[in-house]
UniProtKB/Swiss-Prot annotation:
Gene that encodes the chain: gvpJ
Each Sequence repeat, start to end: 121-140, 141-161, 162-182, 183-203, 204-224, 225-245
UniProt keyword annotations, A-Z: Gas vesicle, Repeat
Family: Belongs to the gas vesicle GvpA family.
Organism: Dolichospermum flosaquae (Anabaena flos-aquae)
Pfam families: Gas_vesicle
Record's keyword annotation contains ATP-binding: no
Subcellular location, principal: other
Identification of the protein by name: Gas vesicle protein J
Gene Ontology CC entries for this record: gas vesicle; vesicle membrane
Binding partners and assembly: Interacts with GvpA.
Length: 248
């Protein structure tokens, strides 16, 4: 009998070729169609669960995954160069923002430091001006009778009513600046000439009255004065004698 060895070899080669093509086709189909592996793995001892693992595995080609809407590797900075650029730009923007905030804080702090001395200077100026100009003191004074300097004779009486809205007096070099005051004079006797003898009744409003005092006199202070009887200076030929009565 003749051996049949060559026939067996040819059949083997045919079988291997068909098996190789079958595996390639299977892998291509799997990648083209896609395959999902899902399962749970749990390890427990004596009804006590120690480890629990859930597996969700997808095996497919890149094109098939994109068709299914899976493209997470494009946003992964370790797998995509575009994502790495975005991460670098984000870091640069954060550094710029921090530098701008630091500059803004420095500018605001410097502006606050500059405003503080200005407020202090204004307060010093106000203090100096207040020290130069004394504050007015409202003190009511009631004068019932006052006799002025006269040379002699009986002076004529002049009944007047005055409201002095502004009273300023100039003092010596040691005294302070003049201060406005309000004086109400109910009865006033003015200077008369040698020929005048009859009393005159009048009402006068004096808006600005200035009087000079001697160097040794103190500074005037704003006050409210009510004079009921006042006798002024008369001429040399007319003598006068009036008893003064002052109530302060």
């Amino acid at each position: 009998m003749l051996p049949t060895r060559p026939q067996t070899n040819s059949s083997r080669t045919i079988n291997t070729s068909t098996q190789g093509s079958t595996l390639a086709d299977i892998l291509e189909r799997v990648l083209d169609k896609g395959i999902v592996i899902a399962g749970d793995i749990s390890i427990s001892i004596a009804s006590t669960e120690l480890v629990h693992i859930r597996i969700r595995l997808l095996i497919s080609s890149v094109d098939k995954a994109k068709e299914m809407g899976i493209n997470w590797w494009e946003s992964d900075p370790y797998l995509s160069t575009k994502a790495q650029r975005l991460v670098e730009e984000n870091q640069q923007l954060q550094h710029r923002l921090e530098s701008l905030e630091a500059k803004l804080n420095s500018l605001t702090s410097s502006s606050v430091k500059e405003e503080i001395p200005l407020a202090a200077d204004v307060k010093d100026d106000l203090y100096q001006t207040s020290a130069k100009i004394p504050s007015p003191v409202d003190t009511p004074i009631e004068v019932l009778d006052f006799q002025a300097q006269s040379s002699g004779g009986t002076p004529p009486y002049v009944n007047t009513s005055m409201e002095i809205l502004d009273f300023q007096a100039q003092t010596s070099a040691e005294s302070s600046s003049p201060v406005g005051s309000t004086v109400e004079i109910l009865d006033f006797q003015a200077q008369t000439s040698e020929e005048s003898s009859s009393p005159v009744v009048s009402t006068v409003e004096i808006l600005d009255f200035q009087a000079q005092t001697s160097e040794e006199s103190s500074s005037p202070v704003g006050s409210t004065v009510e004079i009921l009887d006042f006798q002024a200076q008369t001429s040399e030929e007319i003598p006068s004698s009036v008893d003064p009565a002052i109530d302060v």
